[in-house]
C-alpha cells in the first residue's frame, strides 16, 4: 500500500503548517511506515493511506515519487 506522509524537516521545532512537506512511501501499515522512517531527523505529523481514486489523483501530481526503503 502507498502512504502519504506529512512531516516537518526539523524534529526539534514546533510544527508550522506552511513548512509541512510530504513524501510517498510503500509499506504494509502505518507502523511499518514509522519503522522505515525512524532514525531520520523529521517530525511526522500525519500518515495517510492512499488507495482507489485518491491514489490515482495523487499519481497525477508532478511531486508523486514513491520513496523506496528496504525493510
From Swiss-Prot:
One of its GO terms (biological process) is DNA-templated transcription. Its EC number is 2.7.7.6. It catalyses: RNA(n) + a ribonucleoside 5'-triphosphate = RNA(n+1) + diphosphate. InterPro entries: RpoY (IPR009907). Pfam families: RpoY. It comes from the Bacteria. Keywords: DNA-directed RNA polymerase, Nucleotidyltransferase, Transcription, Transferase. GO terms for molecular function: DNA binding; DNA-directed RNA polymerase activity. GO terms for cellular component: DNA-directed RNA polymerase complex. Belongs to the RNA polymerase subunit epsilon family. Monomer. RNAP is composed of a core of 2 alpha, a beta and a beta' subunit. The core is associated with a delta subunit, and at least one of epsilon or omega. When a sigma factor is associated with the core the holoenzyme is formed, which can initiate transcription. A non-essential component of RNA polymerase (RNAP). Has a similar structure to bacteriophage T7 protein Gp2 (AC P03704), which is known to bind to RNAP in the DNA binding-cleft. Unlike Gp2 however, this protein does not inhibit transcription initiation. This is DNA-directed RNA polymerase subunit epsilon. The lineage of its organism: Bacteria, Bacillati, Bacillota, Bacilli, Bacillales.
Amino acid at each position: 500500500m502507498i502512504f502519504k506522509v506529512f512531516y516537518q524537516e526539523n524534529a526539534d521545532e514546533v510544527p508550522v503548517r506552511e513548512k509541512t512537506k510530504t513524501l510517498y512511501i510503500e509499506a504494509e501499515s502505518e507502523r511499518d511506515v514509522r519503522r522505515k522512517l525512524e532514525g531520520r531527523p523529521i517530525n511526522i505529523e500525519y500518515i495517510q493511506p492512499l488507495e482507489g481514486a485518491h491514489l490515482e489523483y495523487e499519481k497525477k501530481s508532478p511531486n508523486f515519487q514513491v520513496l523506496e526503503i528496504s525493510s
